[in-house]
Each structure stands twice: as C-alpha cells, then as structure tokens.
Regions:
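Hydrophobic ligand-binding cavity/cleft-lining segments
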Residues: 1-46
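Hydrophobic/aromatic beta-strand elements that line small-molecule binding cavities or substrate pockets
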Residues: 44-46, 68-72, 91-99
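A conserved amphipathic terminal alpha-helix motif
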Residues: 122-159
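Beta-strand elements of well-folded, non-transmembrane domains
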Residues: 10-12, 62-64, 112-116
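Short solvent-exposed loop/turn micro-motifs enriched in small/polar/acidic residues
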Residues: 38-40, 64, 88-90
Length: 159
C-alpha cells in the first residue's frame, strides 16, 4: 500500500491574495468538479452520476489511465476521492486544516494500492515517491489556480 500525507500552508506570500477557508473550500469544490485547471496531469474529467448535493461519481484520465472516483464533500473541511476502478485504487483526502499557529493549510493524504506492484517492494517505494512528488506539484498548482481566480474575482466564497 502506498501512503503519504503532506501539509502545505495556504497563505505564505504576503504579496498574494489572502485565501480564507471559504475561498479554499470553493476552490476545492471547483477542483473536484473540473480538475483540469488545477491538476496538470489530469487530461479529462466527466461527471458520471450525481448521488446527492455532496456526492458524485466522476471519471478522470490521469497520465493516460482512466479512473473512476466517488467524490464526497464534507463542507468547509474535506473532499474525499475514493478510487473505485483503474490501476490505482484507494482513497485521497484534500483537507482544509488550521495549524497550531492558526495558519490555514491544505493537507493532502493518499492511501492507495497499485495493480501489478508487490507490497513493500522497491517498485512500490519508487511509485510512492513519484506519486508524492506529483501531489506536491498538484497542491502548488491548486493554490496557484485559487489565487489566480481570487485575483480575477472568479472564486466566490461558498454559499
């Protein structure tokens, strides 16, 4: 099983727009609905089924692999992506947290199994390192896109 968790502070640059919890939440919702502007390795996304206001099934193409995910919103706190089909199965969490110092942060956690790779193997460790680096880049891209949208006033707070 490939597991990793990283936390990135949201408001580190005083010259950038300050993102509130509401703005970050709205950005995460937008990312869940259409990840293309936020995650460079995702080339396609289609909502397959809406199960409720806080839950839907989507199909994404991630580095050429087609993956089905059940996406669940926990308002103002977390988005859960449960990968149910594809080569890589498991759970990805995008959480909005407050650190001990009170600063807002995004915590990205994944717990995944990879088809065709033996548990605790060198290949699994290499996959984990590559995936972790990809997620750090995705977090940076997500925050950059949120700031751009905030500057353009295209990122309204969730209502």
């Amino acid at each position: 099983m490939v597991q990793a968790s990283r936390t990135i502070k949201v408001n580190t640059d005083p010259n950038e727009p300050r993102l509130t919890r509401g703005l970050v939440w709205r950005g995460l919702m937008m990312k869940a609905e259409n990840p293309l502007p936020f995650v460079p390795v995702i080339s396609a996304c289609r909502i397959v089924e809406r199960q409720s206001a806080d839950k839907f099934v989507r199909e994404i193409v991630d580095k050429g692999d087609t993956i089905t995910e059940v996406v669940t919103f926990y308002p103002e706190r977390m988005v859960k992506f449960e990968r149910t089909s594809g080569r890589v199965l498991g759970t990805i969490l995008n959480e909005i947290i407050e650190e001990v110092d009170g600063d807002l942060a995004l915590k990205f956690t994944f717990s995944l199994t990879v088809e065709g790779i033996a548990a605790d193997s060198a290949e699994e460790r290499e996959f984990a390192a590559t995936m972790e680096q990809g997620y750090l880049m995705a977090v940076a891209a997500t925050l950059k896109a949120m700031r751009k949208l905030a500057k353009e006033s295209a990122l309204p707070a969730a209502s």
